[in-house]
Every structure is written in C-alpha cells, then in structure tokens.
C-alpha cells in the first residue's frame, strides 16, 4: 500500500466542489493509498531528520462532512512513499523553509511533488522569463521611471506583484491614468519590491486559460476563465467564470514547448496560464481547476497524476 502525504491549507475550510487537492486525495483513496494529512505547522526537523505530526484521513464527496481523521501520529517523513506539497501561496520565507524540510525527506528517498528545489527556483511570475518567445513583452523592475517608460512605450499595460495569487493586486493601466504613480508605489512598496509590467493582451475577453501539465504531458482540456463584465482579470477568485474547453493548436504548441523543462525539473503537476497565444504564468505551487475540467469531460487528471507518481515510485524501487 502506498503511503501518501499531503501538505495543504486547512481541510476544514476548502470548497470540495472546486478543490484540486481534495480531488487528488479522492483518487488516492480510490486506489487504496493511506493518506497522511499535514499543514505547514505539522512539519519539523530534528537533527536533520524531517518529521511531521500527521493525521490519517478518509474522505467523502459530501458537502456536510467531507473528511474524517482516523489516527494521529508523529512520523519521520521517510516513512511515506510520496508527498504532495499543495500549500497555496503566499510564497514567503515560511513557505521556503517548508521546502527545505521536504527536501530532507526527498534526500531520504521520498518522492515530493512538486520537487522542493524547483518550487524555490521557479517563481510563478518570473519563470516565464525562461520562455520569452512565448510571453507578452515583459519587464521586471523596482524603478518607477522604468515602469513609466514601459507604459509610455506600450500604451495599455498590466502591472502585478511577483508573489500574488487569485488575481490579487493586478492593475491594468492605460494612457493618461492618473493613478499610475500610486499604483507603482503600492506594488513596489516605494521601490523596495520588484514588480512585473506586461503588455496587455486584449484576448483576455476570450478567457485566461488554465492548461494543466502532468509529468510533461499537457492535458487535452483547459479551463478558460472569463472575466466578469468590466473586469480585466479572469481569475475565478476575482469573480471570473470558468468555461472548460479543448486545447487549441496554439495552446498545445505553448504547452509542448514548456513541458520538457517542467518534467526535467521534477514539476509533475503544473498549471500554465495562457491568454490568446501568450504564456503569462507558470503555476507550480498548488495549481487548481481539476474539478471543473473533470466535471465537463471524460478525463481523470488526478488519475494521470497518480499514474505518474506510481511510475516514479516503481522506477526508484527497481
């Protein structure tokens, strides 16, 4: 029996209709795995050994009570076969410390999904810089005058922090916007923080597409997140609506261009954000949208993920 750990946000407050971590656990349970639930504060290190206070959990597809803890124990993480790191951003120093603890478990033979070092290396906004031919024109800086010059040159632009999620603090700035200076001050914390400027992609009205890539294989369907009327952000958390769709030829091309790098870096489950024909983000921490896509199409994305985990476990056991 496979022992699977999962580090996530509190299970009591998830929305099971939309939660991808819940979908992953349901599939693992269907396969007979023993599931060890953990939150960040359950992880600890002693003399270089990674440990955790875990709760073995059973799940049900029931909005009135979707989980039950069966037992509580403190274990060495090396007792687990695999661990899903599914903690949502913010990607802060606490998150980074947790990846070091998980890396100690990885050193002892545990498969950690996604790979802890790659979680640190591949910032969701900045990692697109390794694929400049696929992205909108992009600049990352702390300097207000550079952002203003970028806006001057490109007209309609998007400004965003490097550490947000769910569309938080994303601004669209057009010519003559009287708020440009205060937006820059807010995003850069008066020149103390980097922020990203990108040319605006008008195709956002047709949706910000979330494309899932499992172990280097793009899934054939995506979730297009359509902005609410008068909005420029498609994020569901910002009021957008999700529309499952098959991948277009352009979507496939973008996903296949990025996929080999993801696989090589041990990023088994990744969400690409694509607007029109431009890659805008590479989400590696806790990508979502599984539930919406699986509800619309005859596909088990979680099944493909567990297959990939089992393949890797078999390969290391040989």
Curated annotation (Swiss-Prot):
The keyword Manganese applies. It comes from the Bacteria. Pathway: Sulfur metabolism; glutathione biosynthesis; glutathione from L-cysteine and L-glutamate: step 2/2. Its cofactor is Mg(2+); Mn(2+). ATP binds at residues 150-207. Belongs to the prokaryotic GSH synthase family. This is Glutathione synthetase. It comes from Vibrio cholerae serotype O1 (strain ATCC 39315 / El Tor Inaba N16961).
